Amino acid sequence: IVFDELNMIDEVKGAEFAIMSPVGYSGRNRTAKNARWLYGIAVDLDGVEMEQLRDVFHQMKHDFLPQCTYCVNSGHGLHLYYLFEKPVPLYRHLQDQLREFKYELIRKIWNRYTSTYTEREQVQYQGIFQGFRMVGTQSKLGKRYPVTAFETGERVTVEYLNGFLMDDSKAVTDFKYKSDLSLAEAKKKYPESVSYTH
């Protein structure tokens, strides 16, 4: 379990198997019910050889695909991380919308130029809670080949990613980002809206 201090991340370096998703939870269990914040979207792209890797970045450079924040080498494939400028709340009504949004993004990213897996049934659609091997841990290739991350872009917004969807009906628009206001600032700015607990 990783808490806000993130100190557990250093402790898993070199571990044989440790996964994490870009989701913040309340409570000790990693369940949809306990999910509070989505910090980004991680897309698993398999069947990537040098030709496909070049094409992934070519498509990003020419705005056919969204520019990822981090590209992670996971052994036989890539994990493309699109970290958000601000976390998105994981209200229950948004979870299904965000899953469909991610599926549509995967459909765009996983194409005949970015993967050797060219059949639609070979595409792997993972939900928003899917965890992947952590950077610094062992890849499927063993301890001599740790999972490695490369910073490839800036943090993104949901609105930016919406612009790359092939089906506009999958765009996520009805939500508010996490506020930068502290509780004290919110009470001062919105005294009638912020409830006080004693």
Which ranges hold each PLM region?
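Short, compositionally biased segments
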Residues: 193-194
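Catalytic "initiation/cleavage/transfer" segments centered on a nucleophilic residue
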Residues: 113-190
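Signature for HUH/AEP ssDNA processing cores
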Residues: 1-78, 84-100, 104
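Conserved small/polar residues in nucleotide/adenosyl-binding loops
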Residues: 197-198
